[in-house]
Amino acid sequence: MSIPLLNYSLSTQNQRVDGYEVSPGEEQPRAYNTDNLPSAVEMDEVIWAAYRQIFSEHQILSSTSAPYLESQLRFNQIKVKDFIKGLILSESFRKLNYDVNNNYRFVEICVQRILGRDVYNEREKLAWSIVIASKGLESFINMLIESDEYEENFGDSIVPYQRRRIIAQRSKGEMPFNLKTPRYGADFKEKFGMPQFIWQGPVRQFRPQEQRPKAGDPALFLGMVNDLATV
């Protein structure tokens, strides 16, 4: 008997705010899709957008390319949804993301890149981590891609993207996922012996040589005056 998905509450996120923009600006994400029989150039853009979404820009390598899946997508043998699933389940994605992270962080990465939103809370991380531990990686990916949330927002033909990163009601948008969630977590950085740039002593202020006070400048005597004032 399989363990049911643990219930978790929702939290306030931009993607839960309905948009009523008449003409969205260039800051809004572009939805790449194959609805209108794209040309060869447009199909290249769709494929590139899929790689950029799933592997993020810092993981797009020659080893992550999937020419067989690309060929199937170009000849309409599979849908964009199948292409996304193939990239997620590829060996290269597993090595770059699953093998170097714990289940909680891997859940966060997959929710961001597949569903286009951040995790709601720690309980959602726990719920999906239990799925990975009990049913395996492939079942976890299938549950995300076959979910109602994915179907309502992306369907079979749209490349996932970060939903509603910028809304008119707020002066600042949410941080892009590729900047918010780097490849390694803090625990794996320590495990791999990566340098931690932590200064042990006080950080002194640096002043360029041309801005240093010269002989006769009253600023040279400012420190002495302050010392006298405190006595």
Swiss-Prot record:
PBS-linker domain span: 11-191
Compartments, as annotated in UniProt: Plastid, Chloroplast; Plastid, Chloroplast thylakoid membrane
Pfam families named among the record's database cross-references: PBS_linker_poly
Gene Ontology terms: biological process: photosynthesis
Cysteine pairs bridged by disulfides in the record: none
Lineage of the species this protein comes from: Eukaryota, Rhodophyta, Bangiophyceae, Bangiales, Bangiaceae
Species this chain originates from: Porphyra purpurea (Red seaweed)
Encoding gene, per UniProt annotation: cpcG
Protein name, as recorded: Phycobilisome rod-core linker polypeptide cpcG
Entries under InterPro entries matching the protein: PBS_linker_dom, PBS_linker_sf, Phycobilisome
Major place of residence: plastid
Subunit description: The phycobilisome is a hemidiscoidal structure that is composed of two distinct substructures: a core complex and a number of rods radiating from the core.
Function statement: Rod-core linker protein required for attachment of phycocyanin to allophycocyanin in cores of phycobilisomes. Linker polypeptides determine the state of aggregation and the location of the disk-shaped phycobiliprotein units within the phycobilisome and modulate their spectroscopic properties in order to mediate a directed and optimal energy transfer.
